[in-house]
């Protein structure tokens, strides 16, 4: 019997919605990365995008454990000398809710064309509303509540 290898035309991408209220950032990010890659499916093939679409709502209410809200630092550089900027998690969540989650998930995905296609299937919204109701996403529960 030959080893099964999924073809891009044979893969169906489902839509899921996750409510991130009071969930821990890393636990949500790891589960989302696993589902974006498609590793939860029996037809997983490393060189084919077998993952699903993930819509995350209430990303502004994500939590981190310990003192990471002030200690976790995100860096970016403008490209000019001395152009490095540092932002902690609390300020990032205030200005751009959901960007910390996007960065965490992006770091867990492969780098290259396939990884870039996977991250495009992630939709993050700070509030409870999202424009993807036409896709009829299924509710996905993640056990990552902060204690």
Swiss-Prot record:
Pfam families: Ribosomal_L13 (PF00572)
UniProt keyword list: Ribonucleoprotein, Ribosomal protein
InterPro entries on file: Ribosomal_uL13, Ribosomal_uL13_bac-type, Ribosomal_uL13_sf
A cellular component term, taken from the record's GO annotations: cytosolic large ribosomal subunit
SUPFAM superfamilies: Ribosomal protein L13
Listed GO biological process terms: negative regulation of translation; translation
MF GO annotations: mRNA binding; structural constituent of ribosome
Ribonucleoprotein is among the record's keywords: yes
Family: Belongs to the universal ribosomal protein uL13 family.
Subunit-structure text: Part of the 50S ribosomal subunit.
Its job: This protein is one of the early assembly proteins of the 50S ribosomal subunit, although it is not seen to bind rRNA by itself. It is important during the early stages of 50S assembly.
Official protein name in the record: Large ribosomal subunit protein uL13
